[in-house]
Amino acid sequence: MIAQVIDGRAEAARLTDNVRARAHRFTDEFGRCPGLAVVLIGDDPASSVYVKAKTEKARSTGILSSSHRLPSDTTEDALLRLIDQLNRDRTVDGILVQLPLPPHIAPERVLQRILPCKDVDGFHPVNAGLLATGQPGLVPCTPLGCLRLVQSVAAELVGQNVVVVGRSTIVGRPAAQVFLNADCSVTILHKESRDVPGHCRSADILVVAAGSPGLVRRDWVKPGAVVIDVGINRIPVSSGYRLVGDVDFEGVQYVASAITPVPGGVGPMTVAALMENTVACAEALAIRAPEVMSPDNRLHFDHADV
């Protein structure tokens, strides 16, 4: 048996078509495009590539995208002032600060400064809390993309055993919560977990986000499992580098029923989910039309509407 390769680009295109239609309806109704502001600090090559991809996708989806590029020596206070400005801007529905940030800037302070209703990455504690309690809110883009990819090949999620390898606040923890909210039975593993291979072999759905190239091998995977590889690792080769995931694709494809490739799997869905979150923010903000800001630049907003 050779696994079905889940085409993340094709699934992302289908989601993007839906989001584009929503964006056009929004523009027709409210006389402006949904707006996304992307903030990049420094000149990290990988971050620059990611920002370019996001802004280009936004424009092709009917979202007005603005880029704010700041030098690497930008102070934390200066960055926070920019975020305050974007929070107040009624033409900006979503704010994304590209990670990682320079060492002198605390990411927690920056991400918490973004209004929860404009937090398209879903990283604000308010949105994390809504996800944890099973309420509607903005879900981090990569976990949301993982769920959509699984739904594209799995007839039923209820009661499925899901194992998430990795406990980062960006992917691992929210991914576990996303599948728990879908009525799956979820186990989350990390570097201190015992018998990681054994736990992985219990998974009907295996989500790997460990940041370790080729970590999950063929003998770690239950026959027929769905494997979602979130890892993106650069491996040096004679011509430069190649991208590989956290899963040994060549071996695991002969055991799994379906598997995502790297590249071309989770990555495109992450960007598509970002567009979906941006339009959702625009729709919610337009409906509520909030007029009052609190002193700390938090909108009086019913987050369950997002």
UniProtKB/Swiss-Prot annotation:
CDD domains: NAD_bind_m-THF_DH_Cyclohyd. Keywords: Amino-acid biosynthesis, Histidine biosynthesis, Hydrolase, Methionine biosynthesis, Multifunctional enzyme, NADP, One-carbon metabolism, Oxidoreductase, Plasmid, Purine biosynthesis. PROSITE patterns: THF_DHG_CYH_2 (PS00767). The keyword Cytoplasm does not apply. Pathway: One-carbon metabolism; tetrahydrofolate interconversion. Its EC number is 1.5.1.5, 3.5.4.9. This is Bifunctional protein FolD. It comes from Methylorubrum extorquens (strain CM4 / NCIMB 13688). The gene is folD.
